[in-house]
Each structure stands twice: as C-alpha cells, then as structure tokens.
C-alpha cells in the first residue's frame, strides 16, 4: 500500500515543483513565496496546529485584490495536476493499476469456485451481458476541454517517465514537455467565458469517444476475451460486443429550452459525420495492412475480376468510397444544403459490417487468423459498439409538456380539455386513438410554439435513421397516461418501429407509486401487445434525494426496483432498469461495484443502463486505459450480481428501513422545507447565487425562474453544499434516524444488516465517504464570514447533528475511524485537503468582498469575480465532483 502510494506522492510532488517554477517565471519570487507560505500553513493547520490555522485565515483575508487571482489559480491548478497524477496512478503498473485487469479474472475464479455454478451457466451469463452507458452533459464538466486535453498529455508524460529503460536525454525531453504543458495551462484562462451550447456539449461527448473510447473499447474486449479463454476456455464471438454508448447531449430537453427539435436533428447529423470520420481512419489503416492475395471463393466472387489481385484492398476501397460520399452528404446537410442522397449512403450498421466481416471470414478460412484478429477485429467491434450513429441519443422531455400539447389539441378539436380530464378519461381517449387507423392531427391546425416544439421533436425521431434514437424518457412521470401520451404523439408523427418509452420516476411519491403505474399499463391489452415483452423504466436518484434526503430516497429506489422486477417477472416482461445516478453521493453516485451489488436481486437481468454524468465521464473514461478499468469493473459486477445475487432482505430489515426512511425524511424536510431560516441560511452560507454566474452547462440552474429549494435543480443544490464543505444533502436525516433506531434497542440488528446486506452496508459506506470530505471548521468559517449572526444558531445545530451522525455510523460499522477499509481513498482526500482548504477560506473571503460591494451599490471588482470562479472550479477539483 505505502509503496504503491509513494509513486503517487512523488509524481504529485514533481508536478507541484514544476508548477511552482512556472509561477515564479510568470509572476516572480514574491507570489511563489506567498503561495508556499499558505501551503505550509495549510499543512500545519491540517495537522492540528491551531495557531497556524489562525495565521492561515489572517493571511488569506489580508491578500490584496491583485494577489487573489494568482493564489487561487495556483491552488486550483495544483489540484488539477494532483487529479491527473491520481488518474494515472489508477492505471499505473506501480499503483492501483497493478490489479485492474485482474478484476475480471478474480470474478471468474470466484464464480468457478461456487459449487452451484457450472461453466456453462457462467458462459450463458457472459453471453447475456449488456451494458449501456448514457453520457450526459450535466452536472456539467467544470474543467474546460482545452485544459482536459493538456492534462491528458501530462498523463502521457507520466506514463513514459515510468519506463525504467528510458535514457537520460529522453527523460530530459519528457521533463521539458511537462514544463511546456504546465506553462500552457498556467497561461490559459481556466474559466469559460461563455456557456456551452447543446451542440458544444455534444462535441465534448464525441471528443471522449475519439480520444478514449475508440481505442479503449476494443482493448477492453481483448482483455475480456483473454480472461475468458484463460479461465473458461471460451472465446467471445466476433459479433459479441456487450457495451453500447448513448448520449443525452442534444436530446435532453427537460427544463432546457436551448435543446430544440432542430438541435436534435443537427446533433444526430453531426454524430453520423463524426462516425464516418473515425471509420475512414480505420479503413485507411486496413487498406494499408490487408495487402494479402489469398482469399476464399466467396470473397473472390464478391470482388469480381477487377479485384482478384488484391481482394481485401479492393473491397475496402469500395467501402472507403461509400464513407467519403456519406461524409460529404452529411457535411452539406450540416451546412443547410439539401442534396439528393448518394448511392450507397451509409445509414445502417450492416452496410459497414458486411464487407468487413467478409474479409474477416476469408482471412480466418485461409489460415491468416493472426491478421484477422488484429486491426480488423477491432474495427468490427467498433461497428457493433458505435456503428453508423457513433452514439445513439435519448430524447428526454417533461410529462407536463405532452399533457399541455394534447390539451391544446383537444380544445381545438372541440372535444373538451384533456388537461382537466380524470386519469380514467385520459386513458380511455389515448387507447381509443392508439387503436384508431385515422390520423388525429388536423392539417388546418396551427399549434402554439411550445406544442409545435413537442410535435417537431417526435418528427425528428421519426426522420432519423432507425437505431439512432435509443429511447424516449419522460421525466416527472406520475401516471399511465403520461406514458400512453408519448406513444400517441409518436404514432401521429408516423413512427414505424417500437421505440422504448421509459417513464422516469424521480420524487419519493412517484417512486412509491411506480409499481402501481406499471401494473396498470401492463393490464392494458394494446400496451401489452405493443411493447413486445420489453419495458424500460428509469429510476431517478438526484431529485428523489433532494425531495426526501438520501436515506428515504435510497430505500424508495430499492423498493421501487424490487416491486417492478417482481411485477415484470410475473407478467413475462423483460425489464431494463435505467439508473439516473449522479457523480456525487447526494445524487446517487457510488463506486460502481458496490452500487450494483447493493441493488435488489434480479435488477441486472435485463442488463445495466446507467447515466455517466459530467465530470465523472472524465474520471472514468478520460483515457483508454481508464476505460478498460471502468468497463472491467462494470462487467465483473454485473456477472456477480446476476450469478450470485445479494440476499432478499429479511422482513425485520425491511421494517427497520421503513422506520429509518420515515424518521430521516421527516427530519430532512423539517429543515429544508419547514424551517423558515433554512433558505436564507442556504443562500448566504453557500455560493448558490454566485454559481449561476459560472458558464457551465447549456441548461438553466432552475426549472422555473422563481421559487425556493424545490425549484432549484438537484445539481446546483448539491454543488453549492459541496463548496462550503458541509455537504448537507448527502447526509441530512440519515444519522439522526440511525441514532433513534439505536436508542430503541436495535443496534445489534443494524450491525447484522451492515454485515449481511450489501444494500445497507453500501449506504453506510457512502455516508463514510461523505463524512471524510466534510469539514466542520470550514463550514463554520463560511458562517462567520457570510451569514447574519441571527442565523448562526441554525448552522451550529446542523454541524452538531453532523458530529453525532459520524459517531453513530462508525459505531454501527464497527470502524475506529472513517474509511478504515479504503485507506487509499482516505489518503487521497488528506493529500488534497492541504490544497483545497486555502481555496475554501479564500472563497469565503471573496464571497464576503463581492457581496459587500453589491450591498454598497459598488461596481463588482473583476479581479474578485474571476478569483471567485477559480476557487469554485478548484474546490470542485479538490472534492472530485461538482454536483
């Protein structure tokens, strides 16, 4: 452990030294000395030196406006470098990476050792593996793309420096390159000047595919294949690719008026253009490599006389021509030109697959398997994973938008007001229209702008090549009519295939009603016939936690999944649960392996579909090697969950969870909704108001422009509390509920649940992770600097509650200190705290100055505003998540 960790420490220290030299070159010795003094005070303060803590506060409070920005940038950039070193450490042979590829091998060995499992059963489970990762733009990657690219290059330098065999001049060249990259980062503005548009966000997603996933996915499949061969003597079929990527960028219009039908059409075209671009590069390499002459009669017949001398090249050159013609046509469409479709326009995956697979079969048959299983196999697997669309998109819209559209239509038709009908009347109308052969939309109707947008979105889905759109997600779904309404709107748009329509249940009440809603739907003959035995349901993590607190939300999520699994099993329906998890704990985030094994038994039978959000995409898929590691973790967790499902919870455990849920929800809502001081306290103790100024995502921070916490999106809600280190949404209510149940004499039962039930132990593990990142003295400092004295009592009450929570969780988990079983994460947090603490203190000071100027009616000082934005980005880097 320590030896592994020393490699990380030495990289962090080396990068820190290069950054220090860069600062000295750019701004002189004085600023560097100031930064170094602050760092030493912070380190000593962390070690418990109270005098140095006070000196740290005084030093940061006394910085002049000219010193603010360089100091904030120094610590913020250091944290970005530390995160880069840590990401490299996770894949480095000297660090965590030493055990990464082993994760699949370990799982396969564990499964083989189970007397009740034979190799055939394990093989079947492998063949039914299905993993769909849905990339989303929120909670908005706070780091600019240009800096992410530079950090990727820093990573590459660290990798090469790890090679013992490099000679001195190569080492010197690499160190020079590192100095250049860190200097480039220092002289680059780390804060975007403008909000990204939905198209910018989509391009960011495509960049992840190009820079990491394109190489990472085939390498992961090679790794999986090798482990299967070694442990089961089984090879993956060529056409078996268990992983798919979907995106919400350009498709998610829930609360984001910037995502229109036109934008969705544009992003779909852009995605296809990027796919042709990447496949062209692959085909070019294959044309160069596959110069072989010998081929099967089938391939020779395919290429005819003209291609007999170099059959593989001949076939691939034809494919290259198709790709080029398709790319030119897409380019014209993106520029708004309407050209006739060229012959052989690529719109379906088979058009790519067939010629490539013909080459593969011929090479194998002619004894050239070693060549077939090289670049060609990688390209075939990319066709299966990415294909013509590159990434499919989900369309997401809020349920009320569909209701309003149908209300407008029925009023126009003079048949009443759909919006005011009872649920039974709505269902009767929808089923009647779904069964009807005549169109419902009159040609003469001119709908409002909002309704046109809903109808145009359905039309965009219908016009897209089949397979480009993965699902239609209905947020805030509450009733069967919410689902039927979307099916009707798609029917009216002329859809010719069964697109999965997934209701998203995301508040506590909606999660509790989810099974009733789905049971009613499955009892409708038209619906049962239409879905052809398959149903997708999305479980919302962020909004349910914001609505009821993490303990009540996580239990509602578990129960909803459990009931849905049983209902669908009974009805003979294959259920895919789609998990809308965030990166942060307050929005359902958790280490993948633990999170999946803590779900109800049977929850992964229909595969795993999960959102990968914002900055977590970079941490988990930012490099090809990290992609291999992340996909391997998911694979082993799905296999384990399906073959060795967690136990069904005992009735007594369910009763305790019901109790914990009720107590924690009451306490959480008692503060967040009912305490009149809470919203003013939240607004002043956190940078919530200032976060709106950060040009993060394309989506507004609020669903509605006015209103309190309930109208705020889950992401800024979490982001704000992460900044002031109280991290309140991730724990409020949970510990107090545990305390009450312990007082009722049930501690032994809780300890048993922690030991024997993965769901419960994961909950406590996630609380420990949060507690290791919170900081009571910093949260108190924010109060003193920013909150009116009459609200201090509330802050004190919350901090005392938190202290009690930490004690009770440690007692139930039988741990002497936080993160006892994950020392590597605890070390990592401690290392970053030395650099995050000054940013937090500085942020409180900057908020104080900025708000004071506003109160006095003075013009905001741009140096203060810029430094404030840098501290927000820096703290996010230190905490390893935004929202």
Swiss-Prot record:
Keyword field contains Glycoprotein: no
Source domain of life: Bacteria
Catalyzed chemical reaction(s): oxaloacetate + phosphate = phosphoenolpyruvate + hydrogencarbonate
Entry's EC annotation: 4.1.1.31
An example molecular function term from Gene Ontology annotations: phosphoenolpyruvate carboxylase activity
Keywords: Carbon dioxide fixation, Lyase, Magnesium
Disulfide bonds: none
SUPFAM superfamilies reported in the protein's UniProt record: Phosphoenolpyruvate/pyruvate domain
BP terms from Gene Ontology: carbon fixation; oxaloacetate metabolic process; tricarboxylic acid cycle
One cellular-component annotation, GO: cytosol
Keyword Endoplasmic reticulum set for record: no
The name this protein goes by in its record: Phosphoenolpyruvate carboxylase
Organism for this UniProt entry: Enterobacter sp. (strain 638)
């Amino acid at each position: 452990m320590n030896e592994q960790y020393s490699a990380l420490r030495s990289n962090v220290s080396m990068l820190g030294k290069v950054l220090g030299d860069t600062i000295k070159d750019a701004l002189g010795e004085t600023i560097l000395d100031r930064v170094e003094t602050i760092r030493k005070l912070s380190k000593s303060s962390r070690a418990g030196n109270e005098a140095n803590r006070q000196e740290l506060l005084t030093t940061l409070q006394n910085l002049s406006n000219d010193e603010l920005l360089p100091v904030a940038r120094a610590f913020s950039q250091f944290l970005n470098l530390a995160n880069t070193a840590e990401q490299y450490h996770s894949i480095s042979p000297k660090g965590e990476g030493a055990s990464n590829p082993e994760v699949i091998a370990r799982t396969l060995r564990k499964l083989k050792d189970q007397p009740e499992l034979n190799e055939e059963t394990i093989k079947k489970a492998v063949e039914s593996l299905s993993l769909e990762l849905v990339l989303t733009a929120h909670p908005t990657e706070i780091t600019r793309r240009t800096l992410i690219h530079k950090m990727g290059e820093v990573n590459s330098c660290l990798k090469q420096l790890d090679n013992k065999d490099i000679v001195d001049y190569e080492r010197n060249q690499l160190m020079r390159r590192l100095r250049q990259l860190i200097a480039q980062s220092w002289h680059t503005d780390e804060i975007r000047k403008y909000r990204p548009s939905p198209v910018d966000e989509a391009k960011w997603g495509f960049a992840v595919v190009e820079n990491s996933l394109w190489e990472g996915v085939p390498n992961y499949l090679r790794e999986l294949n090798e482990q299967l061969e070694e442990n089961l003597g089984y090879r993956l079929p060529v056409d078996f690719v268990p992983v798919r990527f979907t995106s919400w960028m350009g498709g998610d219009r829930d609360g984001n008026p910037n995502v229109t039908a036109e934008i969705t059409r544009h992003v779909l075209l852009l995605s296809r253009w990027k796919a042709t671009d990447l496949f062209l590069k692959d085909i070019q390499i294959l044309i160069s490599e596959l110069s072989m002459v010998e081929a099967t009669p089938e391939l020779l017949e395919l290429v005819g006389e003209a291609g007999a001398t170099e059959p593989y090249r001949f076939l691939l050159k034809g494919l290259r021509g198709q790709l080029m013609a398709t790319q030119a046509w897409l380019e014209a469409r993106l520029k708004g030109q309407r050209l006739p479709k060229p012959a052989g326009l690529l719109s379906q995956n088979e058009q790519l697959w067939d010629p490539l697979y013909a080459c593969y079969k011929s090479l194998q048959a002619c004894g050239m398997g070693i060549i077939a299983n090289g670049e060609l196999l990688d390209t075939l697997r990319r066709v299966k994973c990415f294909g013509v669309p590159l990434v499919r998109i989900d369309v997401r819209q809020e349920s009320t938008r569909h209701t309003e559209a149908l209300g407008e239509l029925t009023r126009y038709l003079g048949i009443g007001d759909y919006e005011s009908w009872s649920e039974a009347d709505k269902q009767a109308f929808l089923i009647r229209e779904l069964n009807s052969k005549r169109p419902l939309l009159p040609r003469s109707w001119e709908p409002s702008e909002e309704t046109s947008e809903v109808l145009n979105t359905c039309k965009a889905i219908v016009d897209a090549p089949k397979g480009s759109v993965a699902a239609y997600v209905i947020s805030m779904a509450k009733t069967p009519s919410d689902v039927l309404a979307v099916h009707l709107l798609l029917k009216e748009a002329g859809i010719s295939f069964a697109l999965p329509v997934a209701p998203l249940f995301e508040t506590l009440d909606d999660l509790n009603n989810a099974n009733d809603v789905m049971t009613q739907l499955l009892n409708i003959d038209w619906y049962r016939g239409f879905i052809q035995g398959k149903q997708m349901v999305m479980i919302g993590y962020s909004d349910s936690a914001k609505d009821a607190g993490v303990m009540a939300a996580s239990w509602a999520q578990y129960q909803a999944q459990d009931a849905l699994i049983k209902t669908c099993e009974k009805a003979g329906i294959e259920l895919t649960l789609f998990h809308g998890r965030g990166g942060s704990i307050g929005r359902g985030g958790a280490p993948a392996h633990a999170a999946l094994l803590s779900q109800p038994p049977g929850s992964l039978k229909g595969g795993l579909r999960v959102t990968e959000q914002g900055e977590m995409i970079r941490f988990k898929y930012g490099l090809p090697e990290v992609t291999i590691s992340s996909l391997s973790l998911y694979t082993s967790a799905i296999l384990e969950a399906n073959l060795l499902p967690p136990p069904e919870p005992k009735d007594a455990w369910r009763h305790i969870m019901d109790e914990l849920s009720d107590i924690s929800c009451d306490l959480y809502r008692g503060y967040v909704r009912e305490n009149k001081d809470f919203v003013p306290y939240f607004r002043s103790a956190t940078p919530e108001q200032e976060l709106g100024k950060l040009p993060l995502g394309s989506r507004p921070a609020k669903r509605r422009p006015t209103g309190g916490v309930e109208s705020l999106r889950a992401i800024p809600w979490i982001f704000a509390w992460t900044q002031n280190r109280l991290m309140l949404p991730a724990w409020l209510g949970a510990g107090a509920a545990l305390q009450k149940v312990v007082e009722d004499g049930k501690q032994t039962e809780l300890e048993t649940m922690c030991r024997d039930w993965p769901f419960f132990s994961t909950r406590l593990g996630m609380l420990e992770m949060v507690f290791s990142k919170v900081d009571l003295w910093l949260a108190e400092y924010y109060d003193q600097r920013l909150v009116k004295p009459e609200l201090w009592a509330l802050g004190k009450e919350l901090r005392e509650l938190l202290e009690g929570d930490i004690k009770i969780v440690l007692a139930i988990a039988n741990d002497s200190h936080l993160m006892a079983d994950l020392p590597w994460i605890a070390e990592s947090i401690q290392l970053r705290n030395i650099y995050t603490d000054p940013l937090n203190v500085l942020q409180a000071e900057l908020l104080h100055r900025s708000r004071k100027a506003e109160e006095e009616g003075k013009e905001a000082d741009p140096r203060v505003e810029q430094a404030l934005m840098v501290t927000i980005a820096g703290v996010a880097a230190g905490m390893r998540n935004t929202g």
